[in-house]
């Protein structure tokens, strides 16, 4: 396909946003401006729909079926993959992006990379700072460590005391991660048997926590006492 014939094909909204993201980010880089983390990904969504903070809804542009659980622990990998995709103009498409992401934004990529092997992609990837990759990994690991710590602490709570756990972690761990931990933890407590996650999906999480505490109080002394004995000894000894 000639350059002229490619130019005659109108660009879709998302393709225009991708090319604008490349142009704007390269301009800022050449001007010596400080770039934010994952600048190409940020510029793409800003040009596409005005998003200043990339959300789950934004990432569903690439995978409509993406859930909060699937994104859990993988957000940085998604942002990194999108950043690489835009900067390389579709030549490098990393997981977890779907295989058609490159052609969706840069249709001409199939003509540019048809004769290139994965070895070429690896060479392109070498221009990215190893330090940046390490920092991203360290941030991801640090966050996962926080989530793990929150999960461990939750194990030492009963529905009576879960409110204090939420207060401690609500500003340190993402709400969707706290929700996942809570619903998994709550499955073993009789006082919470009547609470189904789907019934509360549109309610603020703090209200779910409040309802859990209320359910424990209304369950009766015998149930509360049993649930206290269901948690590890550390909580009972500290009480």
Curated annotation (Swiss-Prot):
What keywords are assigned to this protein? Plasmid
For this protein, the record's InterPro entries field holds: Uncharacterised_PsiA
Enumerate the Pfam families for this protein: PsiA
As for what it does, the entry says: Not yet known.
Which NCBIfam families does the UniProt entry name for this protein? PRK13704.1
Q: Which family does it belong to?
A: To PsiA protein of plasmid R6-5.
Q: What name has this protein been given in UniProt?
A: Protein PsiA
Q: Provide the species name.
A: Escherichia coli (strain K12)
From the UniProt record, report the name of the gene that encodes this protein: psiA
């Amino acid at each position: 396909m000639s350059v002229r014939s490619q130019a005659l094909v109108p660009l879709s909204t998302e393709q225009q946003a991708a090319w604008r993201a490349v142009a704007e980010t390269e301009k800022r880089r050449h001007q010596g401006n400080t770039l934010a983390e994952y600048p190409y990904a940020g510029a793409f969504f800003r040009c596409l729909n005005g998003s200043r903070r990339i959300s789950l809804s934004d990432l569903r542009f690439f995978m409509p079926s993406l859930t909060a659980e699937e994104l859990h622990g993988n957000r940085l990998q998604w942002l990194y993959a999108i950043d690489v995709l835009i900067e390389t103009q579709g030549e490098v498409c990393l997981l977890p992006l779907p295989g058609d992401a490159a052609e969706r934004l840069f249709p001409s990529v199939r003509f540019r990379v048809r004769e290139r092997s994965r070895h070429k992609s690896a060479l392109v990837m070498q221009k990215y700072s190893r330090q940046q990759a390490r920092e991203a990994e360290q941030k991801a690991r640090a966050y996962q460590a926080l989530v793990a710590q929150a999960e461990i602490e939750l194990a030492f709570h009963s529905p009576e005391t879960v409110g204090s756990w939420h207060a401690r972690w609500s500003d340190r761990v993402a709400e969707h991660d706290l929700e996942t931990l809570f619903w998994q933890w709550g499955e073993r407590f009789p006082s919470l048997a009547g609470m189904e996650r789907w019934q509360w999906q549109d309610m603020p999480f703090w209200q779910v926590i409040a309802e859990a505490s209320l359910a424990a109080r209304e369950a009766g002394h015998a149930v509360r006492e049993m649930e206290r004995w269901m948690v590890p000894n550390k909580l009972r000894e500290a009480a």
